[in-house]
């Protein structure tokens, strides 16, 4: 038997095998809340035999979303839907994981099938982007973000802590930070 199909333990978390489903954005949330799409999608992946299923990039704040369709854990109301996903993944035999992050200068973008470019701040669905420096991501995402202040940095740091706590409350056993 190859190592791929053997259990793997990291600290107090044991995976049934070494197959992990990485976080892949679904862009199907509403205002940061998971929808009817999410639970069957992730539970189905767990039923497929993976040892670890990591839920998509989940924003720590509304302005930290990549698109308006991204999931979030910036408020307590978002825990319930995420808990149903974590519980379903665990019931299917996999370890529930989640990736939390802040999109920075790549935020406020359209979903890939809607153009994958920035949504301007004043347009419907768009918001102000912030980043450590006022430098655009590149030609595909040319919007120049507002340079973060020290207060912004402290707030985003606190947002990561709060989202991690909510992820734990929702039942996730594996946390991945995207920065």
What spans do the regions from the language model cover?
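N-terminal amphipathic alpha-helix/helix-capping segment at the start of soluble metabolic enzymes
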Residues: 1-20, 89
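N-terminal binding-site loop/beta-alpha segment at the start of enzyme catalytic domains
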Residues: 10-11, 17-36
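Acidic/aromatic-lined carbohydrate-recognition and catalytic surfaces
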Residues: 18, 55-115, 150-151, 155
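Conserved, mostly hydrophobic/aromatic
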Residues: 21, 45, 49, 89, ...
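Short, acidic/polar
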Residues: 33-45, 155-165
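Non-globular sequence segments
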Residues: 87, 95, 101-168
